Structures are given as structure tokens and as C-alpha cells.
């Protein structure tokens, strides 16, 4: 028989009681975490979000209370009325904050029972992830997930408080808007009132936040849900949360200082004092030093060692003297076995654009002077692994774009190998331990990227990013050399956020659209409302968006975004708990004027 709560009021959370509460009358409510029956004594570990308190049911409580305690099982919801008592010294549990105290029950109410569990919500033995996602409400009872969701709350509050103190307005933007694809596919919402027409869920509030600057709000922010119908990847979510902001009249450094401030506040929630300002490097520097536009600073940068080799040496090694030649240093790896050297070649792969010399010690006999110079340039310690990557012989570049691509190809190959070696020898170098947070800004990204398949230029960030003033004259003559006033904030090789100074002049925005192959008619169809808005006194403005989910994942030391999102989708974009997506009724489809075409008919 289940009990009603009635007018009973909780006096304490389960994790609050301390030795100083001994003798107090208490009312606790929560879930039975564990039950131990010793006959005349029954122990219940009672749990809520704050922690666990041990409840003791003695013979003095009476037969009715004892019978109720005998009936309860794990995850039953109960209320306990009793008094706090100090534990005997030899029974103190030093592993929990309430370990000096226990509650002697005078009354026990069973507020709800619990079916046999599909799995035990424990951090020590995890059930299959699909089962846990189906029964997410049970999985969320795990202490680790509780800590992660609490951390998410604390991070969001810290960011909000900081931005509010800096004079930002939190302003909501629409979830039902028009489709303006920004790279990924939109999630479309059909209109019943206007058959055949659709709203789209926003991939970001990009245009709305720019319009807020046109409207004179000066400083905007929002912690906002965004939606992207992307191709499925292992750790992507179709809906995700951004920390979105925009500022009027900024320089890039204006945005940097704001972001550094709220990230410092966010990291303080786990007791980390971030050092600000973060270092900066250009996109070109990042590629040359790290072989990637998201540098991981925890390992040494790559070194340009081309000057270590004489021309005849390069010819002997069958590498291209005109292409980069870089050394990768991985600390504390020690002596490699032959098998490990072979594994480096396997990690590098069979590439046509670059080749690898898996350990410079193997070059010492044939090229001692070159190896000595490499050591001078790369500055390794005695136990460090040094690997050299060079450009393979290739046809002459057809133009400046091809030449840049070939050079960058070598850097990219070296950067990929550097990361692979960093992971392979992580236990030896120890740089990846949780808590080693290295942040930086990457600036001056290319404005455009060449699409070899489509034979046209695409926006590297998005088409509303402003080019550098000094590069305006290259928009038509050499688009690949145009730098954008774009910037990313990067942590340990992960992009936390991306932003830019925006285009605030209608004539420049039209030029960018033209460079992207957009006709005047297409510009009006897709962005006519925005091009018109730009003509009504638009101030210079810029901003950024950072992924809240990923920030919390990193702070929590979690392995997956699904560990920090209360109700995530699977890698196949399915919500197993509510079984979505699902078909809808023919009546609903008819109201919307939609006919579903089966896969076989596509």
C-alpha cells in the first residue's frame, strides 16, 4: 500500500546532515539507493541530488515501520521521519560528507514503488548505451551524470552573470524562421496556413543578432538551442546549445576580451584559474607550426628544418626542395623498437603528397650534419621522438592556388601524424592529463575555400564575415589570398567557438555574394531582407558563438557530449526514450498538404 505525501514537509536534503545536526528532528525524502536487512536492524541508504544519508530502522520503531522497511527495494521513493544521531566511531563512513551521522527512523512512508530495473544506475558498471538512452530517466540518476548536469547549470550561470555585468542584454531570437542554408541542411517546419511553404529551425541566430546590432542594442547574448541536419558523425547532436553574442563597434580584440572573461568565469566552476589574455596566432602560423587550424599546444610545435638539408641530400631522399620539410617532436617517448617505427609508417599512411622519415636516428649515419642541424632547429631532449615529414616529388603547380594547396598538404600530413603520435604515446609524454588546459585564438582565416568538385569558391566561415580591409582589392583577382576578419577560440585541439567581424556595408556584402557565385536574383531571393536592412544605418559589428555542450564536456572530463546533455540523441539522430522521429497520422499530413514519398519511390 502506497502512502500520500499529505502535509509532510522535507526539513533537509539527504546530503546536508552533519555531526552538528545530532539530536535534530528531521524529515528526509528521496530514493532508496541500497537496503541492508540484518533482521532486527534494517539500513536504508537514502539518496537525493545532494547526496546520501544512512537511515536505520530499529525494533523500537515498531512492527509497522519495520514491515514497511522490509518491503522497500532499490529506487523506491520514501519519506523518513526521525532524528539525527552520531554514528559509533567504528562505523563512521569517511567516504561521504554525511558519514558521521545517521537518521533513526520513527516513521516510514512509501511514496512510490519501482519496477525491477532494466539496469542499475551506477557509475562502476555501465549498461549498454542504447539501453541507458532508452531509460534515460534511470540513467540520469547516476552520480556522474548528476554532477555533469549540475556543472552545466553552474557554467551557464557563471557565463550569464559575467555577461550581464559587462552590460550585455540577453535577447531571445525566433526558432521558426526562414530557410537560409549555412552549410548544413535545415530542419524544415511545414506551414498549415500556407500550404507548400516552410519555416526552418535556426542553425544559428546569425542574421537576427546582426539585425539586433542594426537596431541599436549594442551588446547581445543568448544561450540558445540551434539545429543542424548534418551528416551523421560519432559525437554530433542535431540540436545543440550555443553561447551566442554580438557587439557593436568592436575590434577583434574587443570580442577576445569578453570571451576570455566568461571562459575564466566558467572554468572557475571547477577550480581552474585561466590565465588571460590567451595567445594568438594567424591561420597561416597555425598550419605551419601545427599542421591544423585547431592547434593543440600541449605538445611542441613542428619545426621548419628545410635548411638542415643540402640540395643533393633532398634529391637522394626523393623529396621536393620547394615544399615544406618539418620535424615533429613528441616528448619522452624513448627508444623505438623496429615494430614501433613500422607503426609510424602505418599511422602516416600511403600518401602521394608527402613522405615520412620515422626516426631521425636512422638518418644519423648517412646524414650526420643534417641530423645535427635538425636537433638544433627542433630542440628535442634526449628521450624525445623526432620524426621528419617532407613533400614528395610532384608536378609543377599550375597556379598560386595550387602551389598553396601543395605546401599546405605537407603541413596537414605532418599535423595529422603529430596528433596520431600524440595519442599513441600519451601515457609516455603525459601532456594530455585532465586539467592541462591550453587555449589560444586563431585569426586571419582564409575568406574563401576552393571547391574542386564544384569548381567554385565557398565561404570558409560564412558569407557575412568581413574581409581584411587590405585585401579588398584581391576579391576578384585572387580570392584565395583574401584574409577574413575571422577568429576561432581553441582549447587543446578542439574548436570551442568561431566568430568574426561582420560586413556592415551593403555594397561589400553584395560583392562577397558575387564572389561566391550568387547572382543578384539569388541574393535577393535568399537574403533580400538582410541586404535591405544593411542600408538603414548599420554599425560595424562582430561576435562569436561557442558550444556550451562541448565546453561542459571538457570541464567535466566526459568522453561524449551525450554525458553532459540531459536528453541527447543517438549518433543516428534518434531519441530512444520518446522514440522520435516517428510517422504521423494521415490526417496531420493532409492538413499540411504533405505526401510522404517512400524510399523506393525516391
In which residue ranges do the predicted regions lie?
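Class II aminoacyl-tRNA synthetase catalytic cores and aaRS-like
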Residues: 1-602
Amino acid at each position: 500500500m502506497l502512502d500520500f505525501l499529505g502535509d509532510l514537509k522535507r526539513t533537509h536534503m539527504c546530503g546536508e546532515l552533519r555531526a552538528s545536526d545530532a539530536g535534530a528532528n528531521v524529515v528526509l525524502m528521496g530514493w532508496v539507493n541500497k537496503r541492508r536487512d540484518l533482521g532486527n536492524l534494517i539500513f536504508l541508504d537514502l539518496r537525493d541530488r545532494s547526496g546520501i544519508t544512512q537511515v536505520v530502522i530499529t525494533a523500537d520503531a515498531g512492527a509497522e515501520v519495520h514491515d514497511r522497511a522490509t518491503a522497500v527495494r532499490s529506487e523506491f521513493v520514501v519519506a523518513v521521519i526521525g532524528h539525527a544521531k552520531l554514528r559509533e566511531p567504528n562505523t563512521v563512513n569517511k567516504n561521504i560528507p554525511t558519514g558521521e551521522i545517521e537518521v533513526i527512523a520513527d516513521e516510514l512512508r512509501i511514496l512510490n514503488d519501482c519496477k525491477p530495473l532494466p539496469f542499475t544506475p551506477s557509475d562502476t558498471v555501465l549498461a549498454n548505451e542504447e539501453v541507458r538512452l532508452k531509460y534515460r530517466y534511470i540513467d540520469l540518476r547516476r552520480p556522474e551524470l548528476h554532477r555533469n548536469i549540475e556543472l552545466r547549470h553552474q557554467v551557464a550561470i557563471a557565463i550569464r552573470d559575467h555577461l550581464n555585468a559587462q552590460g550585455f542584454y540577453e535577447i531571445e531570437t525566433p526558432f521558426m524562421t526562414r530557410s537560409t542554408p549555412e552549410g548544413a541542411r535545415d530542419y524544415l517546419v511545414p506551414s498549415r496556413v500556407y500550404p507548400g511553404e516552410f519555416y526552418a529551425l535556426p542553425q544559428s541566430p546569425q542574421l537576427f543578432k546582426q539585425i539586433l546590432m542594426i537596431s541599436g542594442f549594442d551588446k547581445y547574448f543568448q544561450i540558445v538551442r540551434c539545429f543542424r541536419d548534418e551528416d551523421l558523425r560519432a559525437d554530433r547532436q542535431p540540436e545543440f546549445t550555443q553561447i551566442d553574442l554580438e557587439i557593436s563597434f568592436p575590434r577583434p580584440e574587443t570580442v577576445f576580451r569578453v570571451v576570455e572573461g566568461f571562459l575564466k568565469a566558467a572554468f572557475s566552476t571547477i577550480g581552474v584559474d585561466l590565465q588571460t589574455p590567451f595567445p594568438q596566432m594567424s591561420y597561416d602560423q597555425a598550419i605551419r607550426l601545427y599542421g591544423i587550424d585547431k592547434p593543440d599546444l600541449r605538445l611542441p610545435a613542428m619545426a621548419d628544418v628545410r635548411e638542415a638539408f643540402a640540395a643533393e641530400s633532398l634529391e637522394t631522399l626523393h623529396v621536393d626542395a620547394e615544399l615544406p620539410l618539418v620535424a615533429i617532436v613528441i616528448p619522452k617517448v624513448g627508444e623505438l623498437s623496429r615494430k614501433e617505427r613500422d607503426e609510424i609508417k602505418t599511422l602516416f599512411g600511403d600518401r602521394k603528397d608527402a613522405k615520412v622519415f620515422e626516426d631521425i636516428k636512422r638518418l644519423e649515419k648517412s646524414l650526420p650534419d643534417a641530423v645535427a642541424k635538425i636537433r638544433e632547429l627542433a630542440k628535442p631532449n634526449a628521450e624525445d621522438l623526432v620524426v621528419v615529414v617532407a613533400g614528395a616529388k610532384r608536378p609543377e603547380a599550375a597556379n598560386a592556388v595550387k602551389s598553396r594547396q601543395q605546401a599546405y598538404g605537407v603541413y596537414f600530413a605532418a599535423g595529422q601524424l603529430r596528433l596520431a603520435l600524440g595519442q599513441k604515446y600519451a601515457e609516455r609524454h603525459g601532456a594530455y592529463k585532465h586539467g592541462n588546459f591550453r587555449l589560444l585564438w586563431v585569426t586571419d582565416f582564409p575568406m574563401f575555400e576552393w571547391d574542386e568538385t564544384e569548381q567554385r569558391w565557398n565561404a570558409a566561415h560564412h558569407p557575412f564575415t568581413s574581409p581584411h580591409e587590405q585585401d579588398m582589392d584581391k576579391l576578384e583577382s585572387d580570392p584565395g589570398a583574401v584574409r577574413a576578419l575571422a577568429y576561432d577560440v581553441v582549447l587543446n585541439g578542439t574548436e570551442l567557438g568561431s566568430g568574426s567581424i561582420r560586413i556592415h556595408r551593403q555594397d561589400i556584402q553584395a560583392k562577397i555574394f558575387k564572389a561566391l557565385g550568387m547572382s543578384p536574383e539569388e541574393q535577393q531571393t535568399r537574403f533580400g531582407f538582410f541586404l535591405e536592412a544593411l542600408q538603414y544605418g548599420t554599425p560595424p559589428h562582430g561576435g562569436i558563438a561557442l558550444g556550451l555542450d562541448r565546453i561542459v564536456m571538457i570541464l567535466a572530463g566526459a568522453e561524449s557530449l551525450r554525458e553532459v546533455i540531459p536528453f541527447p540523441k543517438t549518433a543516428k539522430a534518434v531519441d530512444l526514450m520518446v522514440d522520435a522521429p516517428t510517422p504521423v497520422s494521415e490526417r496531420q499530413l493532409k492538413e499540411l498538404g504533405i505526401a510522404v514519398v517512400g524510399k523506393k519511390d525516391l
